[in-house]
Amino acid sequence: MAVFTPVSLDDLTTWITQFDLGRALAIKGISSGIENSNFFITTERGEYVLTVFEKLTFEQLPFYLNLMRHLAEGGVSVPAPVANRNGSIINALHGKPASIVTKLEGHCQLAPQPVHCAAVGAMLACMHLAAEDFEIRQPNLRGLEWWNEVTPIVMPYLSDSNEQLLATEIISQNAFADSDVFRELPNGPIHADLFRNNVMFEGEQLTGFFDFYFAGCDTWLFDVAVTVNDWCIDDDSGELDQARVRAMLDAYHAIRPFTDAEQGAWQTMLRASALRFWLSRLYDFHMPRDAEMLTPHDPAHFERILRLRIAQTAPALFTTAG
């Protein structure tokens, strides 16, 4: 989240009249993240989140917003899109698509313990199952095809060591994606960006997942790998914290049991997740965009994680007793 397209209170006051939300009372930009322009807004009806989409198009957005609506209606705690009086949940603001969604209660848990990881794992499994019958299909736009597009763009900026790391791993991931094991992996809509700053807690109680704007159809295991690689690590070294990993995986497995194919693909998928975010951070770092309050991320963090996931054996997805 960031602010690329400024929206003033006067802008909001005029625009929001198409909704049954009363008068606009306040608007505040959200600085975290790097993809869209996001704002907390207060109206006579309460607090909401306004997003102006900088890259996603009117044609692409129905997948994301209707997925959120589908999950909310299915009992998964996610922000629900707010429709205007004509029933539209996507509306133009400053010539760009925009939406309003409900605001979750709580705060992000940036120092998670096993209890938090277990809650995230359980809800992630519930989310995957709830989204299984979602009818709209759209690929993960930050999946393998995008990795292949971005690799030659960022390669000239890398050291010899990192150039070799990227070249080797992209070959490995392409081969894996063409394997029988990959084709056996369960798949469907995934969040694809379930970092600590996209989950709300009140104490130890998980109150919801949000920021679904990197969602897409991919393997469920990739979603688990993304989540483990953020929630279950030592923040300085990137090494996996065994207690947090076990808590998350066991809680997920209790609701949506992992398959043998997923067990066999787990190490490779942890690497795939690290590669995806190393590439996106390299791209954003070396191809910066103008924005108010833009917060870039350090690419070296996921380079370290990728090297570790290659060098160290990952904890099993599940034990034979599970």
From Swiss-Prot:
GO terms for molecular function: ATP binding; homoserine kinase activity. Its EC number is 2.7.1.39. InterPro entries: Aminoglycoside_PTrfase (IPR002575), Homoserine_kinase_II (IPR005280), Kinase-like_dom_sf (IPR011009), Pseudomonas-type_ThrB (IPR050249). It catalyses: L-homoserine + ATP = O-phospho-L-homoserine + ADP + H(+). The keyword ATP-binding applies. GO terms for biological process: threonine biosynthetic process. The keyword Transferase applies. This is Homoserine kinase. Signal peptide: none annotated. Keywords: Amino-acid biosynthesis, ATP-binding, Kinase, Nucleotide-binding, Threonine biosynthesis, Transferase. It holds the Pfam family APH. Pathway: Amino-acid biosynthesis; L-threonine biosynthesis; L-threonine from L-aspartate: step 4/5. Belongs to the pseudomonas-type ThrB family. It comes from the Bacteria. Coiled coil: none annotated.
